[in-house]
């Protein structure tokens, strides 16, 4: 991560808020901080509480006016989407804490933890690697079904993620189980199109195949089992929507295979 990005976020924040960078993508940099963005100075919300700061730095290759407009639009769009998703009963997404669209900043609650024995952070990808010695256990099965239910809830309410990889599904411990949370809605949208929902499912399927190929067929079947259960709970109309969506998902999958063959 460049010193320039670190300096730019330091100029935006006040009071020398401590930040630890954890990831950097094409559009944004993600930090953790023990300091709440708008509680009184030097006060934290719990001794071990962490927060997420997602920061969209300035893009030097864009005209400054265009860059500021895009940053404001995308930051506001993601924040509004998260706020709406939080209203859906049963859907697990991070709580929005604060938004500064003019500087490209979104503050969120921190979710997840370090997995035991050095298996890394508790996203779905690392969780499946951690359980590779017992890939078909009840714990893995139930977790994958719950992942499917979360995606089903999102799609039933006509929201799409846009980048549904195993790294963008965080697992939070709930007793002996793990509850999946969908994160990073930078490419998220409101959409009634089965094409957009089919692409979400295809992206996740490919992500699972690419990192857990030996067990991917079973994992993806469990995801679809949970996904289907959400639509089935809405009766005949829900089942009809599910069939339309899966039909399009299979078309998206076929197109993806053709592209892979052609290169």
Curated annotation (Swiss-Prot):
Organism phylogeny: Eukaryota, Fungi, Dikarya, Ascomycota, Saccharomycotina
Subunit annotation: Component of the EKC/KEOPS complex composed of at least BUD32, CGI121, GON7, KAE1 and PCC1; the whole complex dimerizes.
GO cellular component, one term: nucleus
Gene that encodes it: BUD32
Stated name of the protein: EKC/KEOPS complex subunit BUD32
MF GO annotations: ATP binding; hydrolase activity; protein serine kinase activity; protein serine/threonine kinase activity
Family assignment from sequence similarity: Belongs to the protein kinase superfamily. BUD32 family.
EC number(s) from the headed UniProt entry: 3.6.-.-, 2.7.11.1
Domain observations: This protein is considered an atypical serine/threonine kinase, because it lacks the conventional structural elements necessary for the substrate recognition as well as a lysine residue that in all other serine/threonine kinases participates in the catalytic event. BUD32 has protein kinase activity in vitro, but in the context of the EKC/KEOPS complex, the catalytic subunit KAE1 switches the activity of BUD32 from kinase into ATPase.
Pfam families assigned: Kdo (PF06293)
Key words of the record: Activator, ATP-binding, Chromosome, Cytoplasm, Hydrolase, Kinase, Nucleotide-binding, Nucleus, Phosphoprotein, Serine/threonine-protein kinase, Telomere, Transcription, Transcription regulation, Transferase, tRNA processing
Residue ranges of every copy of the Protein kinase domain listed in the record: 16-263
Top-rank lineage group of the source organism: Eukaryota
Active site feature: 163 (proton acceptor)
